[in-house]
Design a protein with these regions (language model features):
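Surface-exposed extracytoplasmic segments
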Residues: 1-130
Length: 130
């Protein structure tokens, strides 16, 4: 299963989100707006080459293979596998740390920002907001 969301203003798509920080890390300038206005079905055609180039600069072990994992930019979830990044997300998962580690082939393992909230054992599970 794969999901993504979009925001519209005046009938025009102005933002979309699949995995956290993908557009932030991989696109620059007007490409950010093109990505936000686009459909994930066209991600590889429209942005594949630039993702491969960026992953190559980051030192990824297999830039093209990893770009195929990251595109299309959707949250994936396979019910036959355990939840956790890249297959969904558990509350304690630090997806930014995981993405940095993944795209830099272990060169960057974290953003030095930790969780500062305690999760609850019952719904709504999230801790108190800051």
């Amino acid at each position: 299963m794969g999901v993504w969301s979009a925001t519209e203003a005046g009938g025009t798509q102005i933002d979309r989100m699949g995995r956290p920080a993908i557009n932030t890390v991989f696109n620059h300038g007007q490409d950010k707006n093109r990505f936000n206005a686009g459909d994930p079905a066209n991600d590889w055609r429209d942005f594949g080459a630039s993702f491969v180039a960026t992953l190559t600069q980051f030192g990824a072990a297999d830039p093209e293979g990893l770009a195929h994992v990251l595109l299309p930019d959707i949250l994936t979830y396979d019910t036959s596998s355990s939840a956790g990044f890249l297959n969904g997300r558990q509350l304690p998962d630090d997806v930014i740390d995981a993405e940095l580690n993944l795209i830099t082939n272990g060169g960057i393992t974290g953003d030095c920002v930790g969780n500062d909230s305690t999760f609850l054992n019952a719904f709504p599970y999230l801790g108190n907001p800051n």
